[in-house]
Every structure is written in C-alpha cells, then in structure tokens.
Swiss-Prot record:
Belongs to the tubulin family. Its cofactor is Mg(2+). GTP binds at Q11, E69, S138, G142, T143, G144, N204, N226. Residues 429-446 have a biased composition (Acidic residues). Pfam families: Tubulin, Tubulin_C. Residues 417-426 have a biased composition (Polar residues). GO terms for molecular function: GTP binding; GTPase activity; metal ion binding; structural constituent of cytoskeleton. The lineage of its organism: Eukaryota, Viridiplantae, Streptophyta, Embryophyta, Tracheophyta. This is Tubulin beta-4 chain.
C-alpha cells in the first residue's frame, strides 16, 4: 500500500490537521475511538494509506503532531477525535516560538527536532511502501514556519526520493496576526522552493471571502475556514484512499503539474460550495461543478487566476459520473478560455475520477492549478518584507537567535527570482525563439 505520513506543526497546522482527520475518519467510517463502524467495504479497501491497524483492530492515524507549546496539543487531545492519535506521536516543547521564525528554525525548534524525527522514523518504518509526507503548517508564525521548514529539510535529507506535499497557510493581505509575518513567510518560502515537491497555497483572507460571499456565513470562525481546507485536503487524496476510474497519486500529481521544478506552488479550489440553506434546491451536474471549480472566487488563496495563465491544472472529481462527460467538460473549459492556458503545453489539464463522494454530497470536485498569477501573493509578501527590512525593523529578534542579515537578503532575492520566473513563463509564447524550446516536452500526458 502507498502510505502517506501526515505531519502537523504549530497552532494553525494542528487545527487544520485535526479537522482533516475528522473528515477522513468520517469518510472511512472510523469512530473517535478508532473502531470501524462503516457500512461499505470500499471504506476499508485502502484504509492503510492514512491508518495503521493496531493489534486490537483499532485504526490509528499515521500522524505526527508537533508544537513548541503545549496549548494547541491539549485542545487537539480533548477535541472530538483526540483519543484516536497515538499518544507518543504528540511531540511538544514548553517555551513557544513567539511568532519568531528563528526560534522555530534555529533555537527552540532545533532542540525539539530530533524527538520529532524519531517519531517520524518510527511511523515510516511501519509503512510497507511509503509514498510521501504531507505537512500542514502556516508560514506567518514561528513554529509552523520555522520548525516546519526545518523538519521538511531534515526529512528531505533522510528520505530524498519520497514526495513532500505541504498545505501552507500564507499570511493574508488584509488580515494580519503579527507584524513580522512577511519576514517569517519569506524565510519559509525560501526553504519550500528548495525542499518541498508540491505546495498547496491557502490563505485566510480568501477562505474568509468564500465563507462570507459563497457560504453566506456572516461571522466565519476559524473552524469554518478549516472545514474548507479539510474538504480540499480530503479531495486531493481521495484517489489514493478509494478505488476510482482514473487514479492518481502524489507523484503522478507532481509529474502532471510541475513543468519546472521551482514552480510548485498550487492554487486549490473545491466545489460545490453552497450555503447550508440552499443546498437542497440544487441538483449537481458535472458542468456545474466544472464551472464553479474554475471560478476565480473559488480559489483558496488571494491571487486571481485571470491575471495570469495556467501552466497546468488538475481536476479531481468524486462521485458516480461518466468519465466521458468529465473529459468533455475539461476540453470545453480549455477551448472557451484558451487565452488563460499557456499554448506551449498542450493537454495541460489532467482529470481523475474517484467513485466515492464526500459525506452528504452526490458529487464533488477538487481543483489544483499551477497558475502564474500566484506571483501576486509572493509579490505582496515581498513588498511588505522589503518595507520593513529596508529599515531593519524587528530584525534584532532574529539576529538575537543567531541569524545573519545575509539570510534575509538571500531569502528576499530567492522570492523575487521566483516571481520573475512565473512572469517569464506567463509571457512566453510557443513560437518564440528562446532558451526553453526543448522544455515543452517536460509535461508528459499520461
């Protein structure tokens, strides 16, 4: 079986992560004590991807939970599914990172990292054929960003040939938790560009907008936002957990979505999103799902795909539907909006179909797009970074933990390079005489 090892770090990561486990447990019919109470054999067929079966027939998530302070962990433990996790897999410090990337990456986090790696190793040895890791974290704080990226680079050293997928919550443009977010995020992106294979980019403001505009929630809580994220996370991995007509795994996903190794930051979307009140008045159809999932308002990060072009995209449909109809709709989208797709990668939209829909829906779809417009997000963070860094504001918090200004400069230029790479491919045309003539073949159609 192709197992995935789930790691969640920091306050944000632990909250998203525990919500994700609620959704996955529900889909596989596993109750909060780890017992199977489902009704369909399909739920158990590939349950090993995310669960370990213990001797007494209980299912234990392949999850590692880490934080530099005990608070969030305690609330996960007392939460609805808190008892399902292996108690040894909670790894936490006492000091906290205080929203300081350097503390998470170099001082406090570095002291705790070995105990986390021990747990990761133990879980990895429990797998038949480990497919890869998925990490939930935010980039604005200290633990998820600093210690999260430290862990990713350590895992990269130890398991170089396994996929590394991250669900990274970026700081949002208008909603800010802490003033040093741009520093933490830039230092993290610097790491993610080098060490992660696929990053699903999320941000609170876009999620907030979806809750407010589409779901008609007047005062969305973090719980509501995390519910959206967990629906997407469940959708990304449903092909691995259930049988389907067109299957896909983390590596296939990467092969189809990443034309150039550094450009692995994806926008994600989910459909159908309807307000709770109007759900029963709508029949879902494949065209409707397709239309909604390509809608810019549906993207879970604050970048507008209409401002850039799609290098590649992937659509995962769930439920009983005809693959023929799915393919027709996908071709239809590409033909109608051809200007939004780069013409030098033909057939750049991949679709997969999984037979089992999420709880309470007859069909659903998850969208993952590699769009050049994501540079808007990096640009925004980079501008805020430069504004503060020019004055060396708040820098003493980082240098005090032993960091060097040089590292900031490097991270800044790496992020700016990333932005200009996206821009370069946005402007590129198929017939242009350029250095990347032979790179058109980089995306194989399976």
């Amino acid at each position: 079986m192709r197992e995935i090892l789930h790691i969640q770090g920091g306050q944000c990561g632990n909250q998203i992560g525990s919500k994700f486990w609620e959704v996955v447990c529900d889909e596989h019919g596993i109750d909060p004590t780890g017992r199977y109470v489902g009704t369909s054999d399909l739920q158990l067929e590939r349950v090993n991807v995310y669960y370990n079966e213990a001797s007494c027939g209980r299912f234990v998530p392949r999850a590692v939970l880490m934080d530099l302070e005990p608070g969030t962990m305690d609330s996960v433990r007392t939460g609805p599914y808190g008892q399902i996790f292996r108690p040894d897999n909670f790894v936490f410090g006492q000091s906290g990172a205080g929203n300081n990337w350097a503390k998470g990456h170099y001082t406090e986090g570095a002291e705790l990292i070995d105990s986390v790696l021990d747990v990761v190793r133990k879980e990895a040895e429990n797998c038949d054929c480990l497919q890869g890791f998925q990490v939930c974290h935010s980039l604005g704080g200290g633990t998820g960003s600093g210690m999260g990226t430290l862990l990713i680079s350590k895992i990269r050293e130890e398991y170089p040939d396994r996929m590394m997928l991250t669900f990274s919550v970026f700081p949002s443009p208008k909603v800010s938790d802490t003033v040093v977010e741009p520093y933490n995020a830039t230092l993290s992106v610097h790491q993610l560009v080098e060490n992660a294979d696929e990053c699903m980019v999320l941000d609170n403001e876009a999620l907030y907008d979806i809750c407010f505009r589409t779901l008609k929630l007047t005062t969305p809580s973090f719980g509501d936002l995390n519910h959206l994220i967990s629906a997407t996370m469940s959708g990304v991995t449903c092909c691995l957990r259930f049988p389907g007509q067109l299957n896909s795994d983390l590596r296939k996903l990467a092969v189809n979505l990443i034309p150039f190794p550094r450009l692995h930051f994806f926008m994600v979307g989910f459909a159908p999103l309807t307000s709770r009140g109007s759900q029963q008045y709508r029949a879902l159809t494949v065209p409707e799902l397709t239309q909604q999932m390509w809608d810019a308002k549906n993207m879970m990060c604050a970048a507008d795909p209409r401002h850039g072009r799609y290098l590649t995209a992937s659509a995962m449909f769930r439920g009983k539907m005809s693959t023929k109809e799915v393919d027709e709709q996908m071709i239809n989208v590409q033909n109608k909006n051809s200007s939004y797709f780069v013409e030098w990668i033909p057939n750049n939209v991949k679709s997969s179909v999984c037979d089992i829909p999420p709880r309470g829906l007859s069909m659903a779809s998850t969208f993952i797009g590699n769009s050049t417009s994501i540079q808007e997000m990096f640009r925004r963070v980079s501008e805020q970074f430069t504004a503060m860094f020019r004055r060396k504001a708040f820098l003493h918090w980082y240098t005090g933990e032993g960091m060097d200004e040089m590292e900031f400069t490097e991270a800044e230029s790496n992020m700016n390079d990333l932005v200009s790479e996206y821009q370069q491919y946005q402007d590129a045309t198929a017939d242009e005489e350029g250095d990347y003539e032979d790179e058109d073949e980089a995306l194989h159609d399976e």
